[in-house]
From Swiss-Prot:
Protein name per Swiss-Prot or TrEMBL: Mediator of RNA polymerase II transcription subunit 8
Species of provenance: Aspergillus niger (strain ATCC MYA-4892 / CBS 513.88 / FGSC A1513)
Keyword Nucleus: yes
Any single biological process term in GO: regulation of transcription by RNA polymerase II
Pfam families per the UniProt record, alphabetical: Med8
Keywords (A to Z) from UniProt: Activator, Nucleus, Transcription, Transcription regulation
Organism taxonomic ancestry: Eukaryota, Fungi, Dikarya, Ascomycota, Pezizomycotina
Protein task: Component of the Mediator complex, a coactivator involved in the regulated transcription of nearly all RNA polymerase II-dependent genes. Mediator functions as a bridge to convey information from gene-specific regulatory proteins to the basal RNA polymerase II transcription machinery. Mediator is recruited to promoters by direct interactions with regulatory proteins and serves as a scaffold for the assembly of a functional preinitiation complex with RNA polymerase II and the general transcription factors.
Subunit structure: Component of the Mediator complex.
Gene expressing this chain: med8
Amino acid sequence: MSSLNQDQIKTLEQSRQRLIQLTHSLASLITSLNQSDPLPSWTSLQSQATIISNNLLTISDHLSDNRDLLSNIVAYPDASYPSRVPANNVALEQVLRTKLDPRVEDWVARGRRAGAPTTSSDAGAGALGQYQTSSGQRLLSDDAIAELWDWAPVAANEEARKRNWGGNYTLEEREMGIENVVTGLSRVLEDDDEEDESDSEEGEGEADEMEVVGARRRSGAGAGLEFDIAAANTGSGANAGAGAKVVAPVVPLDEILRFMTTGAVPGQR
């Protein structure tokens, strides 16, 4: 192979930098696991795992994009390389190594076996879009997977529309009658529609029963007026007033409007 040009040298340098980043990320994770007492939190481990995963993806994409160059390049020591130094011999042996480390070779073999079904051609796929791997596992072909993904969103949406999400009963149970539903619970479930209606009625009633019953000037340096608000007495007769808290007379609406426009305190004109 002829000498490398600047672009090829840049590609090799990028490979080196990415591998260094991955090595530092792995070393940081190993150090935190070995030296931390107690062990790092799950969030810290997840963050480190995410960094390592991103580094692996970056290296994988880089190696795939430059596969032709990296597979054809040949490494050899220059005459000026100090190979007589023992420390340099270790690095030289790693660079000139033609076979992978046994452990790495096992990892690569397992990865290729795991990725083989997804890269297999659809030739020989059965009528149902399935084919059988060398290990006997039956998998869907690429066309069958694409067809499945086209069908799944529509089918899931149609099924979701049939459900009463967040309720105590499904639409099928309501059609059959909720009195016939066996929930297995010791408590009695209430109908959601009736509960929603009662909540809305209570909310409207509470909003109508609030009245301004008094006003006084705010104490301290802050200027302004404070209004006393209490529940209105909606009952009639002696029974309605029994047990009710006696409150100050209601401030007329025109008094409140006059205070808002002129600043005159209610009752002091």
